[in-house]
Amino acid sequence: MCIRDSLVRGVQDVCEKYGYSVLVVNSDDIQEKESSYLKLLYSRRVDGVILTTAGYREEEEFPKEELLLLKKMNIVLIDREINGMTTPIVKVNNFGGAYSAVKYLLAMGHKKIMYLAGIKKTKTNQEREKGYLTALREVQINWKNELAADFRLDTAFQKIVQYWSQLKNSDDLPTAIFSANDLMAIGALKAFAQLKLRVPEDISIIGFDNISFSDCTYPPLTTIAQPTYLMGQKAVETLLKVINKQKIKKSIELETELIERDSVGRWKVSR
């Protein structure tokens, strides 16, 4: 998950209200950097940590040393769970967001919708995949296809170019893509530009996250927005309860919102 200005702002606003200062560190989704920063935060005896774990772990599992360190600190997670811990988490309804994305594509006339997947074993990806499959199943569409990537822009770009180059003008190509995150959706936009395919005339794309530059792409990306400012606020409120040993909800799930831009078009041609 990219660190987003609105999420950090939500954290800062609540912390300032209660007299806490904020130290922000960014792992760039690199596990080694994450481990190093956690050791640094522990050594500085911070009151608590709001953590979005590095996203490219196959099974969202931590090395034992890192897991022991986490258990010594006051922790609240955002977005990604950790196996082996009952840590409180603030997340979004990933199933519901994915479901609404695919229902939107269906309403726009698309019947061949590909799922551009993240890391298969992560809970985030699994919930979004379930939403995709459920939306198709409800309208009895048997055509489904999944292209596995890893949440990264460059990987999605390479996978799309390879897939479309192999099938070329096949009737089995999708007319729309639901991407498990915006970075991969942007990688797909880049790939289709190279393949000289028009978005949304030839292929439609919808992402998930509404990252800060998703409206700066060409065309601007239609996506599912996470309420990141509210997530930051809820994470701090929960962390303060953890610090003060008050009763907490172990999981806070927030709803998503469809943001309509220009990367999805109505499908008019029957394949």
PLM region descriptions:
Residues 50, 112-118:
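Short beta-strand segments enriched in small/hydrophobic residues
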Residues 144, 161, 165-271:
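Flexible loop/turn connectors
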Residues 3-103, 107:
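Alpha-helical recognition/docking segments in bacterial nutrient-uptake
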Residues 4-6, 24-33, 55-58, 80, ...:
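Hinge/beta->alpha junction and helix N-cap segments in small-molecule ligand-binding domains
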